[in-house]
């Protein structure tokens, strides 16, 4: 073997010298001496008669046997009890990062098992600095006992930081399956090859395959002008230095290796001498530019050879390309005989042809489209192969925008656009046209006076240019392609609204006025009356101010007879986007009677591309497509903005699409296409410490708890969903399950799954439990339950015993829940879950979510009073206890605030004293300025979206106000003042949805934004919510208790309609007039409704003007964080309550009628 390796080295060196010459070896180039036929498994045939080198995954029995596929021996695997158990082999130190390997083994079942699930999976376990990963090599290959089955696949090693563990193991979804394995072979896939990585270097095929023009430039293979042969590549339409011919080298280059570049260039128009060079663009976490050669002088009319070289630093690159540029931004030039010679990467990208076609999965719902670049639409490019396999609609990412089609006035260039149309026709695809009008990527000449570019064009001239452009573009495709024209709709106008919902202050608006929008639609309809016409925009899926603005604009346009057929929702979302907001936005806009198309879908990872983030992304993609399917009556297309992560427009690092940078299916693909093959992310929710009472009335303490949402469908796409709140004490896990279900049936029900030790086992252990609760209250007898129906569905109050595990703060309990919905057909039509959307909860706890046992709720107090809103700290604020911002979302130091809260019958008052030594408001975005944001959820529903009662109020240090979402800002008041240490913000927030009273608890949070001297936001800190999503999600707000309204201010004539016959009428009216008790509404007291002993205690303190005191822990059923704890302490010290020795029984009930006596 040593002689063979030496011979191989000599032959490779000789070949390299013949190609490059001896000078190649200064600097030296890497040469591998690996024999690519070497099996990395040293004992893969077991002919040693041992299992040396093999280890156990789990605890199976491994033994050598004479039942063989080759030779005399094989390995027999028995004694399995878990699906993941089997033989394993370590490859740590044997495999190289970035290298691809072929994996093959032979498998046969031990006879006599009669398994109903005889499947084999081969998995690589990998642990690096980013955690533990399970990479599938072969997924559930069927095997038999009748013959040996070859199980084969490929594996490419990738990892982050240090690789700590790497081993391959053979498993089966049948936990007791027994089998033999033999002839295990793992080898590197490809030997080293050296050559030209440019496939179309001479253009003698007469096409531009692999080449594109960057920017506005257009490339074309031309006959009759060539350095050799008959063809060369001509570049025209350049408007910037960097515009020019570009070739994609992604997957073809080995970082760390030198590549020699050689090409010929010629021009015929321009100066006598021009300067030209080649540059490599390599994208990792940012775009890197590597110069191939200095600018070379090229003489007009002469073919000139240009040489250079480059070496990419070792890194992970999502995109690599080489392009030619000139210092003359409009120079047209030819190139020919282009070579980039060096080691050809073994990591050539191939797509997965054995997975479902994406568009076929949704063929009964809507077409699935993708934005493309014409350079990647040659059949040899794996991007084109991926496009053809998975999509049945195309849109041009840039090639149909104004600057691409008409870079100079009257000169239309359709070459790149036509390439996309031709590809669509050849592959039986439809197209969306994008876009006829935009404020970006439109040439300046559109807006300039032709005689003086420093002056603006007139309204009439700009309208004429707009009409000419729209008419020419639509007529081109209609005339050239006729009945074959695949374009079924156009984005007529794009992004005409700004972030605040106003018409964007573009040059179109400035010169023409707001009617430019309707004019564009009129011109398009006139040019092609059969074409569907769309208005397209971003951030209209948030159900906020921009959604409303789009609704109002389209409603107005339709009322004026403008021919608008649909709304394009770009849907550039992120992994924290709210599915309820997206649903509400779709339905709101669709109510206008227009089509809805999702036009630019991707999901920003916000810089986090960890495995956990990718699984979280998968869940949201699944929820999103379930929603799209449920809304299929409105949605007529769903289009992704890019085919794979390597071509995303988003800044790196990012992974926003269904296919990764190597064009392989991501977890999100499987979550959308076949959730049974997905790996769910593990969600986490907090259970707050507390002991709620279970009974006819829902305990008021539940108001303080953030819910989790049971809204991921595993059956159907429309049906019952739920919110779940959790609390705990040393005896029970308490659940409040509120089910939304408008099709009542006794077959409806809840299933609760609990893994007390949270060990995430793949089968049930003795600590694991499944409980059932029917809508009629029947079900598991070993838990406490109370079920009631209401107009929205039904509510279950549950207590699940956990005393046996001695629960403590920060412990975790594995948890999942399933909501079953029978819509009246006698069967379960829809099922939603919280965590495991593979729906394997009945047998597998590994995909349960986590319930974290946490301390009691965060709650602050606002006292009754009416300060003057003047930005000054009046004396009235002196008696208010402050709270502080100390929950960091961005950064870990910077501006912070202490804040105090007061209230009266009209307003909530907030005083924020901000410490900030460097004040800045230069950013155009209000949220990036030095400012204070107050978040209020008046009904404290803690929803993941904003309801009408919710608000986001922002005030910067200069008293400039701004508001988020659908905030009702009417009546809002603020004042600010500068201090030696920063600034003060004082606000009055009007009550719009509730009548406040003593004991009311609202959702509340406060955030401080900190800008640096350049206007960049560098710090965000809140009082409570750590998520950073308070602007769209109220579920993380803290709690604010309203107290202190005096009883002495008499209200005359107080009475209620429902106490006329009550024996306690007189007492109720007297106490209500003194604010000691309050009506449930202005006209209803509800005398028979119960109150808790805690609520009654608070009322008594108000009656006697007794101040609350810090709770000292006298009672076992009162926790220091409970809203009533300090009231209980004051009443206990005053002798008003005694308890029963250990318990105060704060949640025991009395009627509102009884408490007045």
From Swiss-Prot:
Changing residue 602 to N: Loss of activity. GO terms for biological process: xylan catabolic process. Gene3D superfamilies: 2.60.40.1190, Galactose-binding domain-like, Glycosidases. It comes from the Bacteria. Optimum temperature is 70 degrees Celsius. The active site is at 495 (proton donor), 537, 600 (nucleophile). Keywords: Carbohydrate metabolism, Glycosidase, Hydrolase, Polysaccharide degradation, Repeat, Signal, Xylan degradation. Induction: By xylan and xylose. One of its GO terms (molecular function) is endo-1,4-beta-xylanase activity. Changing residue 537 to N: Loss of activity. It is an enzyme of class 3 (hydrolase). Residues 38-189, 195-343 form the CBM-cenC domain. It catalyses: Endohydrolysis of (1->4)-beta-D-xylosidic linkages in xylans. Residues 352-675 form the GH10 domain. Transmembrane segments: none annotated. Optimum pH is 5.5. Belongs to the glycosyl hydrolase 10 (cellulase F) family. Endo-acting enzyme that randomly cleaves the internal xylosidic linkages of the xylan backbone, yielding xylooligosaccharides of various lengths which are further hydrolyzed to xylose molecules by beta-xylosidase (EC 3.2.1.37). Requires at least three xylose residues for catalytic activity. Does not have activity against xylobiose. This is Endo-1,4-beta-xylanase A. It comes from Thermoanaerobacterium saccharolyticum. The lineage of its organism: Bacteria, Bacillati, Bacillota, Clostridia, Thermoanaerobacterales.
């Amino acid at each position: 073997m040593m002689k063979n390796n030496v011979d191989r080295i000599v032959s490779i060196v000789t070949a390299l010298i013949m190609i490059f010459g001896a000078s190649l070896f200064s600097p030296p180039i890497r040469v591998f001496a690996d024999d690519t036929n070497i099996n990395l498994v040293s004992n893969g045939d077991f002919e040693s008669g041992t299992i040396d080198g093999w280890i156990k995954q789990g605890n199976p029995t491994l033994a050598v046997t004479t039942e063989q596929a080759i030779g005399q021996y094989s390995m027999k695997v028995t004694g399995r009890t878990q699906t993941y158990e089997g033989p394993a082999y370590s490859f740590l130190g044997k495999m190289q990062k970035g290298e691809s390997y072929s994996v093959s083994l032979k498998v046969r079942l031990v006879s006599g098992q009669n398994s109903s699930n005889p499947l084999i999976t081969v998995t690589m376990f990998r642990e690096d600095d980013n955690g533990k990963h399970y990479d599938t090599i072969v997924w559930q290959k069927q095997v038999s006992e009748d013959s040996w089955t070859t199980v084969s696949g490929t594996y490419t090693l990738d990892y982050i930081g240090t690789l700590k563990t790497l081993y391959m193991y053979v498993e089966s979804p049948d936990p007791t399956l027994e089998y033999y394995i033999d002839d295990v072979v793992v080898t590197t896939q490809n030997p080293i090859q050296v050559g030209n990585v440019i496939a179309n270097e001479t253009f003698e095929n007469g096409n531009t395959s692999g080449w594109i023009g960057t920017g506005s430039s257009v490339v074309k293979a031309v006959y009759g002008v060539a350095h050799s042969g008959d063809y060369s590549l001509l570049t025209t339409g350049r408007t910037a230095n960097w515009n020019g011919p570009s070739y994609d080298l992604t997957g073809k280059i080995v970082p760390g290796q030198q590549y020699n570049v050689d090409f010929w260039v010629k021009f015929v128009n321009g100066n006598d001498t021009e300067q030209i060079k080649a540059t490599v663009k390599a994208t990792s976490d940012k775009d890197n530019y590597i110069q191939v050669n200095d600018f070379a002088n090229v003489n007009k009319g002469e073919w000139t050879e240009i040489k250079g070289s480059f070496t990419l630093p070792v890194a992970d690159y999502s995109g690599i390309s080489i392009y030619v540029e000139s210092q003359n931004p409009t120079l047209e030039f030819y190139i020919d005989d282009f070579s980039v010679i060096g080691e050809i990467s073994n990591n050539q990208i191939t797509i997965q042809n054995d997975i479902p076609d994406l568009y076929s999965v949704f063929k009964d719902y809507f077409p699935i489209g993708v934005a493309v670049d014409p350079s990647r639409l040659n059949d040899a490019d794996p991007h084109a192969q991926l496009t053809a396999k998975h999509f049945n609609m195309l849109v041009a990412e840039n090639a149909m925008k104004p600057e691409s089609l008409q870079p100079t006035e009257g000169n239309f260039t359709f070459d790149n656009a036509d390439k996309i149309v031709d590809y669509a026709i050849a592959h039986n695809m439809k197209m969306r046209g994008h876009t006829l009008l935009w404020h970006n990527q439109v040439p300046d000449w559109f807006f300039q006076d032709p005689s003086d570019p420093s002056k603006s064009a007139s309204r009439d001239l700009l309208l004429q240019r707009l009409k000419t452009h729209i008419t020419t573009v639509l007529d081109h495709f209609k005339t050239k392609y006729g009945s074959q024209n695949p374009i079924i709709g156009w984005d007529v106008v794009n992004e005409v609204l700004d972030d605040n919902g106003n018409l964007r202050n573009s040059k179109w608006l400035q010169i023409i006025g707001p009617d430019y929008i309707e004019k564009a639609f009129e011109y398009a309809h006139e040019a092609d009356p059969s074409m569907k016409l769309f208005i397209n925009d971003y951030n209209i899926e948030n159900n906020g101010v921009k959604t409303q603005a789009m609704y109002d604009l389209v409603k107005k346009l339709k009322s004026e007879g403008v021919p608008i057929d649909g709304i394009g929702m770009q849907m550039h979302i992120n992994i924290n986007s709210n599915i309820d907001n997206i649903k509400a936005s779709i339905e709101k806009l669709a109510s206008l009677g227009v089509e809805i198309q999702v036009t630019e879908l991707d999901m920003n990872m916000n810089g986090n591309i960890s495995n956990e983030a990718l699984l979280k992304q998968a869940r949201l993609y699944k929820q999103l497509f379930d929603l799209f399917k449920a809304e299929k009556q409105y949605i007529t297309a769903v289009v992704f903005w890019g085919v794979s992560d390597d071509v995303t427009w988003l800044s790196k690092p990012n992974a926003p699409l269904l296919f990764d940078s190597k064009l392989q299916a991501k977890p999100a693909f499987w979550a959308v296409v076949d959730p049974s093959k997905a790996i769910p992310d593990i969600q986490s929710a907090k259970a707050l410490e507390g002991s709620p009472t279970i009974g006819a009335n829902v305990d008021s303490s539940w108001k303080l708890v953030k819910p989790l949402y049971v809204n991921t469908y595993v059956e159907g796409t429309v049906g019952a969903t739920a919110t779940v709140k959790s609390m705990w004490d040393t005896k029970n896990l308490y659940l409040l399950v509120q089910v939304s279900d408008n099709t009542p049936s006794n077959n409806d029900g809840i299933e609760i799954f609990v893994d007390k030790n949270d060990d995430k086992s793949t089968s049930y252990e003795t600590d694991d439990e499944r409980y059932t609760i029917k809508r009629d209250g029947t079900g598991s007898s070993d838990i406490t339950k109370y079920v009631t129906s209401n107009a929205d569905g039904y509510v279950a109050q549950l207590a699940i015993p956990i005393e046996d595990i001695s629960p403590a703060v920060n412990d975790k309990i594995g948890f999942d829940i399933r909501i079953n919905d029978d819509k009246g057909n006698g069967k379960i039509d829809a099922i939603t879950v919280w965590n495991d959307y593979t729906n394997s909860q009945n047998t597998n706890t590994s995909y349960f979510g986590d319930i974290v046992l946490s301390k009691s709720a965060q709650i602050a107090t606002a006292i009754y009073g009416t300060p003057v809103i003047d930005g000054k700290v009046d004396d009235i604020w002196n008696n208010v206890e402050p709270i502080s911002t100390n929950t960091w979302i961005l950064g870990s130091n910077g501006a912070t605030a202490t804040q105090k809260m007061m209230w009266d019958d009209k307003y909530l008052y907030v005083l924020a004293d901000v410490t900030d030594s460097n004040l800045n408001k230069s950013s155009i975005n209000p949220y990036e300025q030095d400012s204070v944001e107050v978040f209020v959820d008046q009904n404290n529903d803690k929803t993941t979206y904003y309801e009408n009662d919710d608000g986001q109020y922002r005030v910067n240090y200069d008293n400039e106000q701004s508001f988020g979402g659908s905030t009702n800002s009417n009546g809002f008041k603020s004042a600010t003042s500068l201090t030696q240490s920063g600034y003060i913000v004082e606000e009055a927030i009007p009550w719009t949805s509730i009548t406040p009273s003593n004991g009311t608890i609202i959702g509340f949070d406060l955030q401080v934004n900190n800008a640096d001297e350049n206007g960049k936001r560098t710090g965000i800190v809140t009082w409570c919510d750590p998520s950073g999503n308070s602007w769209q999600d109220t579920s993380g707000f803290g709690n604010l208790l309203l107290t202190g309204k005096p009883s002495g201010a008499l209200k005359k004539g107080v009475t209620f309609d429902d106490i006329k016959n009550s024996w306690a009428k007189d007492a109720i009216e007297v106490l209500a007039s003194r604010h000691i008790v309050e009506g449930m509404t202005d006209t209803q007291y509800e005398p028979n409704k119960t109150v808790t002993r805690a609520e009654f205690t608070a009322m008594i303190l108000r009656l006697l003007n007794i101040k609350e005191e810090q709770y000292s822990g006298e009672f076992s059923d009162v926790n220091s964080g409970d809203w009533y704890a300090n009231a209980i302490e004051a009443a206990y010290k005053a002798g008003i309550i005694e308890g029963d020795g250990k318990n105060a029984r704060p949640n025991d009930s009395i009627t509102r009628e009884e408490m007045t006596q």
